[in-house]
Regions:
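Glycine-rich phosphate- or other oxyanion-binding loops that anchor nucleotides, phosphorylated ligands
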Residues: 2-175
Length: 175
């Protein structure tokens, strides 16, 4: 695959919270970046179109360890949400794929699905690791689907090309 965009290295952190956190930690310790720019897929929960590039404003974690901490917070670190930008887009990070035909979700999980604009698996752990190491973090998501996983791979190539153009324009002023 592609190794860089305009000399900026590209790293894959994997799918899911655990892989993302582990691999991001290893990358930070080895590369020592000042800024991490995340690009990944997300599911649409509200009004966004497939292929759209979205800058994440706030990211929330799906963890439920009550009574030790409130919903969305990990005990001992008390970081329940991470503000990334003023975009106003709320992202819910969860390893649980949302299926609107299920009825057995926890009440707080459903509240977050209703409150947030998009859902992903990796944004919160990546933001958390960067925050812990005092490294700047921006996250851009492309809307991969509206529940149709059969089109994900086809949409991935389009999403990456859209992100590449957005990245070059945003960070280098070129396209």
């Amino acid at each position: 695959g592609l190794k860089d965009i305009n000399g900026v290295p590209i790293f894959q952190v994997g799918i899911g919270k655990t892989n993302a956190a582990m691999n991001m930690t290893e990358i930070i310790l080895k590369e020592k970046p000042d800024l991490v720019v995340n690009f990944g897929s997300c599911g649409n929960l509200k009004k966004h179109k497939v292929g759209e590039i979205i800058e994440v404003g706030e990211v929330y974690n799906n963890i439920d360890v009550r009574p030790f901490a409130e919903y969305g917070c990990t005990p001992e670190n008390n970081i329940c949400e991470i503000k990334l930008s003023d975009s106003g887009i709320k992202c819910f990070s969860t390893d649980q794929i949302y299926d609107n035909t299920r009825v057995d979700y926890a009440h707080k999980y459903i509240e977050m699905i209703r409150e947030c604009d998009i859902v992903d698996m990796e944004c919160y752990p990546l933001g958390y690791v960067c925050k812990k190491y005092d490294i700047g973090f921006k996250s851009y998501k492309w809307v991969s689907d509206d529940g149709n996983v059969d089109t994900w791979e086809q949409n991935a190539a389009i999403g990456f090309q859209n992100f590449r153009e957005h990245f070059l324009q945003t960070f280098f002023g070129e396209y």
